[in-house]
């Protein structure tokens, strides 16, 4: 069986833990130092629902000064983790902006995304309630999961769930792609 590659992109504001989640998933290691990312890529092979998969993961810059680079990596992504920090409400407020930008770049009404509330281990500092996150998730029509990169809670589940979302999307898209291909095949050429 051919191993399918999935191009996943991790987006979100600065300091929300995008790199911590990604490195915890790839290397089972929690990064304690904050070193703003410009762009890092990682690869991991795993079995998701007993189907082998190769994940190409792009960890992106959250800082606004790198926002011009966002559209470039959004073009190639097949699935997106939209990460915010549960202890930083302003990072949560940015999630709809990231969703709109992805949909605009992809020229789609929907696309595979998973909203991730990181730092669920910091309950005493939490600024975004589960109810508020779930309401936004419903409004944006994006599934939601809470995780902790520090404690490795739901980290693997977030990436695996995103792959499941991508797979469902690709299966749903297949009839439309085949239909377009058949239409193109019926065109005739006329030489003058």
UniProtKB/Swiss-Prot annotation:
The disulfide bonds in this chain are none
UniProt: GTP binding residues: 12-19, 59-63, 118-121
Predominant subcellular localization, coarse grouping: membrane
GO cellular component terms?
plasma membrane
Q: What class of enzyme is it?
A: hydrolase
**In this UniProt entry, which residues carry a covalently attached lipid of the kind S-farnesyl cysteine?**
189
**PANTHER family, alphabetized:** RAS, DI-RAS, AND RHEB FAMILY MEMBERS OF SMALL GTPASE SUPERFAMILY
Whom does it interact with, and what assembly results? Answer: Interacts with hzg.
The protein depicted here goes by the name: Ras-like protein 2
* Gene name per UniProt: Ras64B
């Amino acid at each position: 069986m051919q191993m399918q590659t999935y191009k996943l992109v991790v987006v979100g504001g600065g300091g929300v833990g995008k790199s911590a989640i990604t490195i915890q998933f790839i290397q089972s290691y929690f990064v304690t130092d904050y070193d703003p990312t410009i762009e890092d890529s990682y690869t991991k092979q795993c079995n998701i629902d007993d189907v082998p998969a190769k994940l190409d993961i792009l960890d992106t810059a959250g800082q606004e000064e790198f926002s011009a680079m966002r559209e470039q990596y959004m073009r190639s992504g097949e699935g997106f983790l939209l990460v915010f920090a549960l202890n930083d409400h302003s990072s949560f407020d940015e999630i709809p902006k990231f969703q709109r930008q992805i949909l605009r770049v992809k020229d789609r009404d929907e696309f595979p995304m998973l909203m991730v509330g990181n730092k669920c281990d910091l309950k005493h500092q939490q600024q975004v309630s589960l109810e508020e996150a779930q309401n936004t998730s419903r409004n944006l029509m994006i599934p939601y999961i809470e995780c902790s990169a520090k404690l490795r809670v739901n980290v693997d589940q977030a990436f695996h769930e995103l792959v499941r979302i991508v797979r469902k999307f690709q299966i749903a898209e297949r009839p439309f792609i085949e239909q377009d291909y058949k239409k193109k095949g019926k065109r005739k050429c006329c030489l003058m």
